[in-house]
């Protein structure tokens, strides 16, 4: 499963947005920007847009999406999944994996799992109102209904292909390896400002030329194409970063489906 826009919005509401690079503590090695993105890829005077900040957040959250997917042994709803990713993003994957919340959930004791959220209200042994508020919203989302359950391993939504940068890699080499272009990789990875500055171990969104495509016909909309191909609009937009407005596609345009 993938986190939905509602899940991203929940995390955004707690993280706070900074469009200019800053150091929360002067002694920190690297700068922070966006929704808490921290690392060597943030330059001292860097300024980004809100869209770029969300893209960075999605990149950062992906590891937690993958971690939650691996830890779950039961079917969950989209809202439950979003709440779990937000929770894991805040407490860490290690704490999530060893939590009673996950244990109860995997045992099918959903009500007991939901009751665990409020217990995670401390940092350094001290209770914080911000954590009380966050847990309450995650719990409410977890308990809220969705149209139907999504079975483990049967969701039609697929993750965007990923590639982990190895020693000796550059963006041109990675593009050739995946039958794509540097320009496409930059669109898929808006957090990369300089194609010559990627680091070993960095995870990059990639795409290949062998996937299924659809040529837009008269009367097509992105929603119709998504339904016809058993996918989602958000998935299509992630596969086609050149589409910035789902209402603006043109006849003859080729859209990647996988």
From Swiss-Prot:
This is Endolysin. Disulfide bonds: none annotated. GO terms for biological process: cell wall macromolecule catabolic process; defense response to bacterium; peptidoglycan catabolic process; viral release from host cell by cytolysis. Coiled coil: none annotated. InterPro entries: Bacteriophage_GH24 (IPR051018), Endolysin_autolysin (IPR033907), Endolysin_T4_type (IPR034690), Glyco_hydro_24 (IPR002196), LysM_dom (IPR018392), LysM_dom_sf (IPR036779), Lysozyme-like_dom_sf (IPR023346), Lysozyme_dom_sf (IPR023347). The keyword Hydrolase applies. HAMAP family: ENDOLYSIN_T4. The active site is at residue 15. It catalyses: Hydrolysis of (1->4)-beta-linkages between N-acetylmuramic acid and N-acetyl-D-glucosamine residues in a peptidoglycan and between N-acetyl-D-glucosamine residues in chitodextrins.
């Amino acid at each position: 499963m993938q986190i939905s826009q509602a899940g991203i919005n929940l995390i955004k509401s707690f993280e706070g947005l900074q469009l200019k690079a800053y150091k929360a503590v002067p002694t920190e090695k690297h700068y922070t920007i966006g929704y808490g993105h921290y690392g060597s890829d943030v330059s001292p005077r860097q300024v980004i847009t809100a869209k770029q900040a969300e893209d960075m957040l999605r990149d950062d959250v992906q590891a937690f999406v993958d971690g939650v997917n691996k830890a779950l042994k039961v079917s969950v709803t989209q809202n439950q999944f979003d709440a779990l990713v937000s929770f894991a993003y805040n407490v860490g994957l290690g704490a999530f994996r060893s939590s009673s919340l996950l244990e109860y959930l995997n045992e099918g004791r959903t009500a007991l799992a939901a009751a665990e959220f409020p217990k995670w209200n401390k940092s350094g042994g001290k209770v914080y109102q911000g954590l009380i508020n966050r847990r309450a919203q995650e719990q409410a989302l977890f308990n809220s209904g969705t149209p139907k359950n999504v079975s483990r391993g049967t969701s039609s939504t697929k993750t965007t292909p990923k590639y982990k940068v190895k020693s000796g890699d550059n963006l041109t080499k990675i593009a050739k390896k995946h039958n794509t272009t540097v320009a496409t990789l930059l669109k898929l990875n808006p957090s990369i400002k300089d194609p010559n500055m990627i680091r070993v171990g960095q995870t990059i969104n990639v795409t290949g030329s062998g996937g299924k495509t659809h040529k837009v016909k008269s009367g097509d909309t992105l929603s119709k194409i998504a339904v016809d191909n058993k996918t989602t609009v958000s998935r299509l937009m992630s596969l086609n970063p050149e589409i910035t407005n789902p209402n603006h596609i043109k006849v003859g345009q080729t859209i990647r489906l996988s």
